[in-house]
Amino acid sequence: MLHCSFLRVIPIKNASKRLIIVRSLTSAPAKTSEAEKQQDSLKNIDAGEKYTALGNIRQKKDVFHYTDRASGVGYSHYSSSVYQHRPYIWPPLRKLYHWNYALVIAGMVILMSDFEWLKDQIKSASLPFRPEASQKEEVTESNGEVEEVKEKPKKKKLGFRERRIIEYEDRLRLYSTPDKIFRYFATLKIIDPNEDSGRFEVFMTPEDFLRSFTPGVMQPRRWGLDSFKNYNPEKHKRHKFSDPDSIFYKLGENGLINFSDYLFLMTLLSTSHADFALAFKIFDVDGNGALDKEEFTKVQQLIMSQTTVGQRHRDHITPNQSFRVETNSALETYFFGKDGKGSLSSEKFIEFQERLQHDILKMEFERRDALDNPDGLINEDSFAQLLLLHAQINEKKQKHMLKRVKRRFKGENLKGISFGETKAFFEFLYHIDDVDIALHFHKMAGMSIDAKLLQRVAVKVTGIPLSDHVVDVVITLFDDNLDGKLSHEEMVAVMRRRMRRGLERPRDTGLFRLFDAVLECGKRAYHASPLPFY
């Protein structure tokens, strides 16, 4: 019985084996193809990375795979806390994954592009296709006379890049040393033809000199720190300040300014006439009312040591000879002759200082005139901006003051201000200390300062008549409560800073002065204390 049962079991097992083999044969091609795909995908993978820690074949990772399951079959990297919180990527965007490189490259190209240059190129290329009437002067003939009508230039809006550059240059004017300011704003160099070493001397034009201390005016794009162009006599001999009446013509050929003259001209602009007159009297040993070259050098050194420009000059550490103070500068040649044996009177020197201030004011006026309308007049808003140029008033309050002038002078009230009226008012400001005393006495007497009183004080104190229109603009600019009366305390403070052109300000951020003050207070407390510090 047992033998028979054994024989019966064997066929059953053989039949099951045959069934399993048949099933495996039918499914063998599919498994073989899947295995081949896995093998092909794992060919380029390191042998140690083909399998997981549990011996399973490592599946190919998909960077865009996403699942919300925290655990379970098919979940990988479940031990990582970052994997659960990774950002979800919208499936249509996953197909655009490779376009990210193109977007990054396009963004870098946009950031490095010079749109101003591109705009100028497009404008110059499209110029022949524009109507001639909008670009050229309109010529109208009436009664045999030809009249030219010029289009008013539009004010160019400053972009983000220009505003950042202007802010940097304003900080440079305030806190840098004179030699660095000169190196940044000077644009000309003259190479010495007698030397093969390529040594050169750097010069400023009158426009460069004005730009070096005028805030808000950007240096030309091509020129910057230690970037100069070669001097061309044919080009610069027709300079508009090369006429004999200009003070810059007296400084040398074609009105060029070297570093020594730059330092002393900045000192002239930041020092009053009374200080120079007193210095002349002190160093006039002979008592003849004039100074020789040696005595004038002492006056020059004394005045420069009292100004922020002279105090910040670092002549002892300047490596280039072009930025050292020379003894035979163009100023000394003009004052004492080529041999240096002449004499300089205080009257001649004060006249030179007044002429310098006149030429600087003329350049400032012509720059405003070119922005408004080149007809010899500037509008009231530009005149107000000219007065507030070095006012050191916060931007919000300054905009409020200028807006008051714009509202008052528009339409029929917009008459314009000539250079003669501007010059007369600035000559009135040269006596601002005497004007302050006179206005203070009138206020103590209970008199309100209106337009008529200001004109009367100008004539009595300075002998300079002021036009009604200019006085109206000034009162509107400083009339905070809109009652038609002048707030003379603020006006006097602003005008004093305006006449010094911001050159009296300390050329540092105040941090070192704070440390010096703390150290000085500590020393005084140490010496004044009766108790020992131990």
UniProtKB/Swiss-Prot annotation:
Protein's GO biological process: calcium import into the mitochondrion; mitochondrial calcium ion homeostasis; positive regulation of mitochondrial calcium ion concentration
Boundaries of the annotated transit peptide in chain numbering: 1-32
Location(s), subcellular: Mitochondrion intermembrane space; Mitochondrion inner membrane
GO function terms (MF aspect): calcium ion binding
Annotated SMART domains: EFh (SM00054)
Signal peptide: none
Residues that hold Ca(2+) according to the record: D284, D286, N288, E295
SUPFAM superfamilies: EF-hand
Chain spans, region Disordered: 131-150
Sequence similarity: Belongs to the MICU1 family. MICU1 subfamily.
Function: Calcium sensor of the mitochondrial calcium uniporter (mcu-1) channel, which senses calcium level via its EF-hand domains. At low calcium levels, micu-1 occludes the pore of the mcu-1 channel, preventing mitochondrial calcium uptake. At higher calcium levels, calcium-binding to micu-1 induces a conformational change that weakens mcu-1-micu-1 interactions and moves micu-1 away from the pore, allowing calcium permeation through the mcu-1 channel. Also required to protect against manganese toxicity by preventing manganese uptake by mcu-1.
Segments forming a coiled coil: none
Protein name as catalogued: Calcium uptake protein 1 homolog, mitochondrial
GO CC terms in record: mitochondrial intermembrane space; uniplex complex
Domain remark in the UniProt entry: The EF-hand domains have high affinity for calcium and act as sensors of calcium levels.
Start and end residues of each EF-hand domain: 271-306, 338-359, 466-501
Keyword list, A-Z: Calcium, Calcium transport, Ion transport, Membrane, Metal-binding, Mitochondrion, Mitochondrion inner membrane, Repeat, Transit peptide, Transport
Species this chain originates from: Caenorhabditis elegans
InterPro entries in the cross-refs: EF-hand-dom_pair (IPR011992), EF_Hand_1_Ca_BS (IPR018247), EF_hand_dom (IPR002048), MICU1/2/3 (IPR039800)
Known tissue expression: Expressed at low levels in PLM touch receptor neurons, germ cells, epidermis, and muscles.
